[in-house]
Amino acid sequence: VQSDGFIQGVALDDPANRFNLASGTVSATETKPLWGGVPVAELIPGVSSSPRGSTIRRALGVADIEGFTVFNQAHNGLTTPQSPVPLFASGMSVSFYRFGANMRIPLKASPAVIALGTNNASVKTALAWDFVNNQITTAADAGYAGADIATTAISFTGGVATATTGAAHGLTAGKYITISGAVPAAYNGTVVVTSVPTATTFTYVPASAPSGAATTQGTIGAVTLANITLPAKVISIQSGNSKTVSY
């Protein structure tokens, strides 16, 4: 019997770079477990004289990503009959590779990435992370490229901003957009649409908490793809016999 396929989050063997494997402790503020193939932010572990690696949490945006978690040497992951995938909860240690480690890490891929394998696309094709569907995608597919849209209201509750438009915006969850001109300025920036409750509303997480509802409305515009592109390449694509994680 012969089987060929990747497993999400299990880095491929590489004797030259395997010593770049890092370990950290999942942040106490993390409310969802981590697993292999998740982008993470790396935080300074306080001033302890004997820290057990960095503090790790799920990345909230492109600028936040330091690397990707892996299952390699992470033997403490929790499994249950309902969840055979090893999970790493708050306070547990987890393995990860930083960008620049030159490790090959299988990640869940979007249809846009899989399509690259059928048209001889360059390995340098710009890639972005889909924070809603937890998968790698192309920057061209992830970034909004439509006409400018004006907001009619923006509010902030529980760490999430809700924007309202006067007409149907056509946005989908996972799409990157640029918001500009809003006051407070904390509402502005390149952000990810996290949900679309109605045709005229959507939610996103600002980089910092605004002081209140928007007193001056903003404009939703196209993103600069360089602002959402990851420092990563597609080395190979496998479709049909690989294992990915669903949560």
Task: Please annotate each region the language model reported.
Residues G146-Y176, S180-N227:
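Small/polar beta-strand repeat architecture
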